[in-house]
Amino acid sequence: MVLAGRGMPGTKECLICLTALLLAAAAAAMINGVLDAKLDARMARLHRRVASLERIGAQRATVAAAGMLFAALALSITFLPRLTTALILLAIFSYTPLYTLWFKRRSPWGVVPGGIPGALPVLVGASAVSGTISSAPLILFLVMLLWQPPHFWALALKHQDDYRRAGVPTLPLVRGEAYTKVCIFVFAALLLPASLALWFTGACSARFAIEALCLGFFNLFSCYLYLVKNRRFQRAFQASIFYLLGLLSAVIIDICSRP
């Protein structure tokens, strides 16, 4: 929203958009939990999610998800541009039927198209502010698409036994650890030119470019340190979160500090 509006958005539109996004995301997560219940039950790290769903019940969870989705769409249709509503619907559709029921269960590369719903909130926020989608939010959308696969693969490396028991064909299980680590490095490297495109197109300043470079090299070094040298996959997962938070913060500070 900051990038598209070239500054902090209005309080009202920001709250409405964030509320609609949170409701839609919560609804999608609950539906995902219901659809993946049998898979989750085989994974030790998800025992709390399974226990929570058992206490609530699949039917109640589905009804609650439908209610939250209705509320999200009602807010969006009433107060936000039509494009924003369409993008919210696209995010839900690409996550629930496409990723959860298709890509995740059939391909080790499913996380790549599965990153679309995770990146679409960037365009949702941009369209809520301007009613259109300009080049700068599209670049940030690309950054989010490139960031998500290596972020997930680090987690998949750590929890290989869980995914094996669940029968989910993750990249480490299908192609091996070494191949997965190479893919993580490739995607981490691609984040450098993708983030610098915000400076190259004039959306952000040279100061941001320096910060993006530093963060990008930090991300690559973290991949080497935690994937190759020490095999501490959880740390690699956490470092990627720090990278993204740093990059998004740099964008906001750069835009909002301009005279």
Curated annotation (Swiss-Prot):
It is an enzyme of class 2 (transferase). This is Protoheme IX farnesyltransferase. The gene is ctaB. It comes from Geotalea uraniireducens (strain Rf4) (Geobacter uraniireducens). Belongs to the UbiA prenyltransferase family. Protoheme IX farnesyltransferase subfamily. Pfam families: UbiA. The chain crosses the membrane at residues 15-35, 61-81, 83-103, 109-129, 137-157, 182-202, 208-228, 236-256. Converts heme B (protoheme IX) to heme O by substitution of the vinyl group on carbon 2 of heme B porphyrin ring with a hydroxyethyl farnesyl side group. It is found in: Cell inner membrane. One of its GO terms (molecular function) is protoheme IX farnesyltransferase activity.
